[in-house]
Amino acid sequence: MAIITMKSLLEAGVHFGHQVKRLDPRMKRFIFSERNEIHILDLQKTLQGIKDSYELVQRVIKDGKKVLFVGTKKQASEIIEQEARRSDMPYVNNRWLGGMLSNFNTIRKSVQKLKKLEKMEVDGTFDMISKKEISQLNREKFKLAKNLTGIKDMETLPGAIFIIDPKREQIAINEARKLKIPIISVVDTNCNPDVIDCPIPGNDDAIRSVALFTKIISDAILESDKEVGIQIIENLNEEDLMKEIEIKNDKSDSIEEGRSNL
C-alpha cells in the first residue's frame, strides 16, 4: 500500500507555486497562501487530487487498459521513462507528435516501420545491403525511435493519460479531450485545471516533486491487482504546516529558485 504524508509533499517542494503575477485565475481554488510574492499551494487539495488520481488509475488498469505517461520537459523526461518502464506502461518523453492519439492508426504505421527496421538490423538483412543503404536506414530508425520508442507496444488507445506540465503538453491534452480519454495532470499555479479530469495541484518544475507524483501513479498501476488503495496521513495541522512552510522558505535564497533545486 502506498503511503503519502503531508510532510513528504513538503519535503519534495510540492507546495511551491509560481510568482503571483503568473497565476492562472482558474487555479485560485487551489491556493493556500502567498509568501514573498510566490503562491503556496493547498496541500490538502493536493492530497485529494492524489487520491482521486490513484483510484482512477486503478480502475483503468483493472479494465485492462494502459496509462500513457507524458512529460517532455527536461525535469520530467528521464523520470517519466523510468517510472513508465517500471510499471510497464507506454510513455512519451521527447516530443509529442501531432496525431499520437487523434491519428493513432497513422502513428501505428510509423511504429511498425520502426519495428521492421529494428528487425532488419538483427536478422541479417543489413549484411546483404551496402554501407550507404545501412547508413540511410539507421538514420531513419534513429529518427523514429527518438519519438516512438515509448509507445512501440501501445497497440490501442490508452485508458488514461498522465501529464507533467499541461501548459507544455497542450496538444496531447487537446487530443485526449477530443477522444474523451481521462486526463490526470499535475497542475501548477500557471495552469488551467478545468481541462483536466483529475487535477493534482503541485509544483511541476522541481525534480523531486515531479518524481514523487510520477512514482505515485506508477505505484497505483503496480498495486492495482492487489486490491489495495492509498493511505494518506495528514500528519500536520494548519499551524504546523505554516511553520514547515516558513522553514522551507528560510532554507532557500528564494522560493522561485527552490522550485528547481529541491
From Swiss-Prot:
PROSITE patterns: RIBOSOMAL_S2_1, RIBOSOMAL_S2_2. Belongs to the universal ribosomal protein uS2 family. Pfam families: Ribosomal_S2 (PF00318). GO terms for molecular function: structural constituent of ribosome. Signal peptide: none annotated. The keyword Ribonucleoprotein applies. The keyword Phosphoprotein does not apply. Keywords: Ribonucleoprotein, Ribosomal protein. NCBIfam families: rpsB_bact. The lineage of its organism: Bacteria, Pseudomonadati, Spirochaetota, Spirochaetia, Spirochaetales. This is Small ribosomal subunit protein uS2. GO terms for biological process: translation. GO terms for cellular component: cytosolic small ribosomal subunit.
